[in-house]
Each structure stands twice: as C-alpha cells, then as structure tokens.
C-alpha cells in the first residue's frame, strides 16, 4: 500500500518522490491507487493551509489566500487547472462531440478556458478570504476541501467510460469498482468529519458529491464519457464547491 501511495503522489502531483519508493509497481495497477486520493489531497491542502497561516500575520488575509492558492497549483503542476481549461474550451465550443475532444487536446488556451481559470482561481481566493474573516479554520478547511475534491472525483470514474482511444485518464475511468469507490468516498468523509466537526464538513461533502455527480452526468451526455481533463476539472470545481459550502 505504501508503494501505491508514493506512486500516486508522484503521478498526480509535482512533489519530489524518490523513484525507488514506487519502483516495481505496474502502471496497469494504478487504478487501485484511487483510495489514496483523499490522503494525497489532505497532504496538499495541509501544506497550502500552512502557507496561509504563516503569511497571514505578515501580509494579511487576501495575499495569504493568493499565495496559498498559488502553492496548491504549483504542487500539482497546474495539472488540474489545465484540465479545467481544456474541458471548458471543448464543452463550450458548441461543436460536435469529436471536435470537442479535439479542442480539448489542443495545447493552446482558448477564451472559455481562460475565463474558467480566472473565475476559479479568483473565486478560491475570495472564498478563502471570506472564510478567514469569519474565523473559520483555514488549514482544516483547505485540507478537507482537497481531500474531498479528490475523493469525489471517483464519481467520474465509477461506471463511466473513457471518451478517447487512449490517454492518462484511461488508467482510472471505468477501471474502479463499487468497493473502491465507497472506500474512497468513506475516507474523504472521515477526513471532512474529523477536520471540521459538528457535521459542517460532512454537509459540505454532501453538497460537493451532488455537484460532482451532476457534473459527471452532464459531461457524459456532452462528451460521451470522461477524460483526464474532465477529472482535473472535477477536482478544481470540487475544491471550490466544498469551500463555498462552508460559508
């Protein structure tokens, strides 16, 4: 299990992981690593939250929120934000399904993708600032948001088909079973409940689950399935929805 965790950490983040820690693990077995997603999210959110706490006393709430969001993006290499931008460029192009998928593979940033990035990043900064001004625990909120968003991404993998012939998302989409999905969601719920007691965290997770489930169904209808880009979009939007639900 530890080897699987390190493999997933190096796969979905840019955090330095010695290769020997995940050596010998077959790429086709990576789908089993879905259960580690909430734990990886917990780690990323905790680091981002620590950045906020350290900087808040020095430069104030808005700048602390800005840098915490920046650090979170850097730790993932902008991987999920790129998926969000590509998904919006494709889906909002109002073209045929095949053309949408082609647009999503285009490395160039379009208008819809750019607007989505601006909206999501700015919204995260504003919501974090508002939560801090209301006295909410930012470290716990960010850790829970990142854990839940990665956990609920399993809803776009279970019983969904991959919309392309090949790609990184094919490792997970349609490859995880009901037990893995339940374990992943269960771990995310435990983290949310422990970090944000009083049902606050669990309630926010329920809202996030509903939002991501609806997103998955809409993308399935539009694209005929899911891709790695739509998983990234779900994670980014999941973080934002969870934080909004805490207000």
From Swiss-Prot:
Main subcellular location? membrane
Example of a GO biological process term? cobalamin biosynthetic process
Q: Which compartment or compartments is the protein found in?
A: Cell inner membrane
Q: Does the keyword ATP-binding apply?
A: no
What pathway does the UniProt record associate with this protein? Cofactor biosynthesis; adenosylcobalamin biosynthesis; adenosylcobalamin from cob(II)yrinate a,c-diamide: step 7/7
Which reaction does this chain catalyze? alpha-ribazole + adenosylcob(III)inamide-GDP = adenosylcob(III)alamin + GMP + H(+); alpha-ribazole 5'-phosphate + adenosylcob(III)inamide-GDP = adenosylcob(III)alamin 5'-phosphate + GMP + H(+)
Stated membrane topology is:
Multi-pass membrane protein
According to the UniProt record, what class of enzyme is this? Answer: transferase
Q: What does this gene product do?
A: Joins adenosylcobinamide-GDP and alpha-ribazole to generate adenosylcobalamin (Ado-cobalamin). Also synthesizes adenosylcobalamin 5'-phosphate from adenosylcobinamide-GDP and alpha-ribazole 5'-phosphate.
Task: Spell out the protein name for this chain.
Answer: Adenosylcobinamide-GDP ribazoletransferase
Q: Source species, please?
A: Escherichia coli O139:H28 (strain E24377A / ETEC)
From the broadest rank down, the organism's phylogenetic lineage runs: Bacteria, Pseudomonadati, Pseudomonadota, Gammaproteobacteria, Enterobacterales
């Amino acid at each position: 299990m530890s080897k699987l965790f390190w493999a997933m950490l190096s796969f979905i983040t840019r955090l330095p992981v010695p290769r020997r820690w995940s050596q010998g693990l077959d790429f086709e077995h990576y789908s089993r690593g879905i259960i580690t997603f909430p734990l990886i999210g917990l780690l990323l959110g905790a680091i981002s939250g620590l950045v906020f706490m350290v900087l808040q006393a020095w430069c104030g709430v808005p700048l602390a929120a800005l840098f915490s969001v920046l650090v979170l993006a850097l730790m993932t290499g902008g991987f999920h934000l790129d998926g969000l931008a590509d998904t919006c460029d494709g889906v909002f192009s109002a073209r045929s399904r095949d053309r949408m998928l082609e647009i999503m593979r285009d490395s160039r940033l379009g208008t819809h993708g750019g607007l989505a990035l601006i909206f999501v990043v700015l919204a995260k900064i504003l919501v974090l600032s508002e939560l801090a001004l209301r006295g909410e625990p930012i470290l716990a909120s960010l850790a829970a948001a990142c854990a839940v968003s990665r956990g609920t991404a399993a809803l776009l993998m279970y019983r969904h088909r991959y919309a392309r012939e090949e790609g990184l998302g094919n490792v997970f989409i349609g490859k995880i079973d009901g037990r893995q999905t339940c374990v992943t969601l269960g771990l995310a719920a435990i983290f949310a409940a422990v970090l944000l007691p009083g049902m606050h965290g669990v309630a926010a997770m329920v809202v996030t689950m509903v939002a991501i489930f609806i997103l998955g169904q809409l993308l399935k209808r539009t694209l005929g399935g899911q891709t790695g880009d739509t998983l990234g979009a779900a994670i980014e939007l999941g973080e934002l929805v969870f934080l909004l639900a805490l207000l």
